[in-house]
C-alpha cells in the first residue's frame, strides 16, 4: 500500500502523479477502518482527501503555516504527517486528538476547535512573517459553514485591506454557498486558474498608462466585465471587492487541477482566495447520502452504516421534546440554535413549529442579541447552545440581555465535562461567567424529570434571563427529585456534607454510601439553582459539619464552591475542612467522562478518598 510508505509530507512530494489517486483511495479506506471503531468526525474528512493531499504536495507544512478552521477535517492531515499509527487512540484519554494540536506535531500550526477564527489567526501569522523578515506561506482552511460566523468576515475585511500575501482555502461542500451551474462559469474558472490570464490582465492595464481608470474604454470594459461576473459568478465579486485575488471555483476532487491552482496561488502576491467545491462524505455511500449523520458519529458498522450502540434518550432530546410541547401551548415560545439543530435536540421543535424555529448559523452572539430583541417585544425566545460556544457571546449576554432584565432562556447543552472532543469542547466555563452576571438565574437539573420541571419554571415562572445547564448524554441512576427549592437535602448525615449539582449528584450519593460504610455520617445537598445562590439555606445544611466538600466539574475561579466558601467565612461558620473538588485551573483533555472524572477526583472514589484523608488528618 502506498499509504504505508507515507511517514511525512516529503513522501507525498516524492510520489509520481499517477500514484496520487490510489493514495486518496487508501486514505478513505483508512478513515473508514479507524473512525468506524473510535467514532469521530467522518464525512467532513472524506470530503477533503484530495484537497489535503494537494496541500501537502505543494506546500511544506513543517515550514509553511496551515491554520484549520474548526479542525473537523484534520484527520487526513494527521494521517499524512506521521500519525497513522496513533489512530487507534483517536479522541481517547492520552491518545490522538481529533483536532489540530501543535504539541502533537510541527505540522499543526494552531489549536482549532471553534469556528470562524482561522482567517484572523492566519493574518496574524502573515503580519508576523513580514515584521520578522521571514519567508513562508500562510494558509487558512475554512469551510463555507464557518462563513456564517461574523468573525470570518472581520478577518477577510482586514486581510483584504492589509495587502499581505496569504491564501484562504474555501472548502465549499454546499452547506451554505449556492453552487454555480453551467458550462460557461466552469470554463471561466479554468481560464482564471492559468497564470497567462493574470499576465494578460497586467498587460491590458498597462495599455492605458499609469491611470487606466481615466480611460473611457477601460472603464466601459471594466463595467462590462463586472456585470458579467456578478451574473455568472456571484461568489468572486465578494472576495475581489474585499481585495482578494479570487481563484475558482474548482472541483475539489480533481487532484491535478488542485495542485496547479495551489501552485499558482503560492506564486501570486497579496491575499488570495482559492474556492474549492467538495462533496462531504465522498467515497462512502452512506455518508454521501446522509453527510449530516456522519459528521460527528459514534462507532458504527462500516458494512451497514448503523451505529454499534443504539442511542438512548438524552438531556438534549428531552429538552427539545419538552420545549416543543410547551410551544404547542404558548405561541410566544420560539427556538433558536447556532448551526446545532440536531445536536441540541431541536429537530422535533423545527418539525412541529417551523415558523418559530431559527437557525442563525455559527453566530452565537447574533443569536443572543436576536433573542433579546424578541424578548423585548414580548416573545419567549429559547436559545439552545453548547456551553463551549455560548462563551463567544458573553458581551451580548451582559449588554443586550442582563442589563434590560429580558426574559431570554438559555438551554446550555454539553455543560461540564463532555468527553472525546477535548479541551476546546468541554463546558467548564459557563458556571463562572453566567453566575457573575447580575440578574441571571442559573438552574442545574440532575435528571430528565428535573429538566422538564426547570424548563417549565424558566418559561413561565421566572422573570428575567434564565440559563438551564445540562450535560451531554443520559441521566444517572438515583431517585430524582423535582422540588423547586434552591437547595435540597438528598441524604441525611452529620459529619461530612457533600454539596453538588447536575449529574454529579449521582457521584456524591455513591460516595456518601461508601463513607457511611466507613463510619463517616455523610449528608448530600443538591443545588437546583446556583444563581442566585440561596446561601442561607445552604449554610443551614453545612452548620456543625466537620468537613464540607463542594463537588463541581468546572474551573475553580468563579465556581460555586468559591462563592460558598466565602459565604461561610463571612457568616463566621467554621468547620475543620472546606474542600473545593473541581478542575482547579486545568483544561481537561480528551477521554470519556468517566475517565476524566476519575483523573480529576470528581467520581465517587475521588470524593471518598478526599473526605477520608481530611477526616483522618483531623483525627
List the predicted regions and their residue ranges.
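N-terminal amphipathic, basic-rich helices that act as targeting or association modules
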Residues: 1-80, 238-244, 251-258, 275-276
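Non-catalytic terminal/interface segments that mediate subunit docking, oligomerization
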Residues: 65, 278-390, 396-406, 499-502
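A glycine-rich helix N-cap at a beta->alpha junction
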Residues: 86-96, 161-175, 196, 402-414
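Peripheral docking tails and interdomain loops at the edges
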Residues: 300, 307-311, 419-421, 440-441, ...
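Long, well-ordered, tryptophan-enriched scaffold segments
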Residues: 173-319
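Structural signature of the thiamine diphosphate
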Residues: 217-286, 407-413, 432-479, 547, ...
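Cofactor-binding active-site loop characterized by glycine-rich and histidine/acidic residues
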Residues: 41-162, 315, 332-333, 337-338, ...
Amino acid at each position: 500500500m502506498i499509504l504505508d510508505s507515507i511517514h511525512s509530507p516529503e513522501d507525498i512530494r516524492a510520489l509520481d502523479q499517477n500514484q496520487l489517486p490510489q493514495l486518496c483511495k487508501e486514505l478513505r479506506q483508512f478513515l473508514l477502518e479507524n473512525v468506524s471503531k473510535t467514532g469521530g468526525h467522518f464525512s467532513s474528512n472524506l470530503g477533503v482527501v484530495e484537497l489535503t493531499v494537494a496541500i501537502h504536495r505543494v506546500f511544506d507544512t513543517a515550514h509553511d503555516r496551515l491554520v484549520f478552521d474548526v479542525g473537523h477535517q484534520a484527520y487526513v492531515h494527521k494521517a499524512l504527517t506521521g500519525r497513522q499509527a496513533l489512530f487507534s487512540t483517536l479522541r481517547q484519554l492520552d491518545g490522538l486528538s481529533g483536532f489540530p494540536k501543535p504539541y502533537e506535531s510541527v505540522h499543526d500550526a494552531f489549536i482549532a476547535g471553534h469556528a470562524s477564527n482561522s482567517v484572523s489567526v492566519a493574518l496574524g501569522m502573515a503580519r508576523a512573517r513580514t515584521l520578522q523578515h521571514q519567508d513562508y506561506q500562510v494558509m487558512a482552511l475554512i469551510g463555507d459553514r464557518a462563513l456564517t460566523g461574523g468573525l470570518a468576515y472581520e478577518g477577510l475585511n482586514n486581510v483584504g485591506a492589509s495587502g499581505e500575501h496569504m491564501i484562504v482555502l474555501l472548502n465549499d461542500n454546499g452547506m451554505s454557498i449556492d453552487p454555480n451551474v453551467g458550462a460557461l462559469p466552469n470554463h471561466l474558472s479554468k481560464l482564471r486558474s492559468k497564470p497567462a490570464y493574470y499576465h494578460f490582465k497586467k498587460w491590458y492595464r498597462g495599455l492605458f498608462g499609469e491611470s487606466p481608470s481615466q480611460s473611457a474604454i477601460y472603464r466601459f470594459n471594466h463595467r462590462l466585465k463586472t456585470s458579467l461576473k456578478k451574473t455568472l459568478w456571484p461568489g468572486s465579486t465578494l472576495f475581489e471587492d474585499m481585495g482578494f485575488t479570487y481563484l475558482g471555483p474548482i472541483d475539489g476532487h480533481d487532484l491535478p487541477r488542485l495542485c496547479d491552482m495551489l501552485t499558482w496561488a503560492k506564486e501570486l502576491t497579496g491575499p488570495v482566495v482559492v474556492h474549492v467545491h467538495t462533496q462531504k462524505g465522498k467515497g462512502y455511500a452512506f455518508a454521501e447520502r446522509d453527510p449530516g449523520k456522519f459528521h460527528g458519529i459514534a462507532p458504527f458498522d462500516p458494512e451497514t452504516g448503523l451505529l454499534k450502540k443504539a442511542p438512548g434518550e438524552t438531556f438534549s432530546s428531552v429538552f427539545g421534546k419538552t420545549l416543543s410541547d410547551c410551544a404547542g401551548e404558548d405561541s410566544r415560545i420560539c427556538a433558536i440554535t447556532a448551526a446545532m439543530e440536531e445536536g441540541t435536540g431541536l429537530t422535533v421543535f423545527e418539525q412541529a413549529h417551523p415558523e418559530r424555529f431559527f437557525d442563525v448559523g455559527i453566530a452565537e452572539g447574533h443569536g443572543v442579541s436576536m433573542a433579546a430583541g424578541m424578548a423585548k417585544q414580548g416573545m419567549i425566545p429559547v436559545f439552545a447552545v453548547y456551553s463551549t460556544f455560548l462563551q463567544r457571546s458573553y458581551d451580548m449576554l451582559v449588554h443586550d440581555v442582563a442589563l434590560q432584565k429580558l426574559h431570554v432562556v438559555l438551554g446550555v447543552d454539553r455543560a461540564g465535562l463532555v468527553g472525546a472532543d477535548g479541551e476546546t469542547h468541554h463546558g467548564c466555563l459557563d458556571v463562572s461567567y453566567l453566575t457573575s452576571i447580575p440578574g441571571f438565574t442559573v438552574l442545574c437539573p440532575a435528571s430528565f424529570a428535573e429538566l422538564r420541571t426547570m424548563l417549565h419554571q424558566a418559561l413561565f415562572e421566572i422573570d428575567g434571563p434564565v440559563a438551564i445547564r445540562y450535560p451531554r448524554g443520559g441521566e444517572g441512576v438515583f431517585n430524582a427529585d423535582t422540588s423547586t427549592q434552591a437547595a435540597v437535602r438528598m441524604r441525611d448525615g452529620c459529619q461530612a456534607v457533600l454539596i453538588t449539582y447536575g449529574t454529579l449528584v449521582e457521584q456524591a450519593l455513591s460516595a456518601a454510601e461508601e463513607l457511611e460504610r466507613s463510619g463517616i455520617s455523610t449528608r448530600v445537598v443538591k443545588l437546583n439553582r446556583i444563581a442566585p445562590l440561596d446561601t442561607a439555606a445552604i449554610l443551614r445544611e453545612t452548620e456543625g459539619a466537620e468537613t464540607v466538600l463542594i463537588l463541581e466539574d468546572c474551573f475553580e475561579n468563579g465556581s460555586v464552591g468559591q462563592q460558598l466558601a466565602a459565604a461561610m467565612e463571612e457568616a463566621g461558620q467554621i468547620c475543620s475542612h472546606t474542600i473545593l473538588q473541581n478542575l482547579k485551573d486545568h483544561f481537561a483533555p480528551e477521554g470519556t467522562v468517566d475517565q476524566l472524572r476519575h483523573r480529576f477526583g470528581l467520581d465517587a472514589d475521588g470524593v471518598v478518598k478526599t473526605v477520608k484523608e481530611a477526616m483522618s488528618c483531623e483525627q
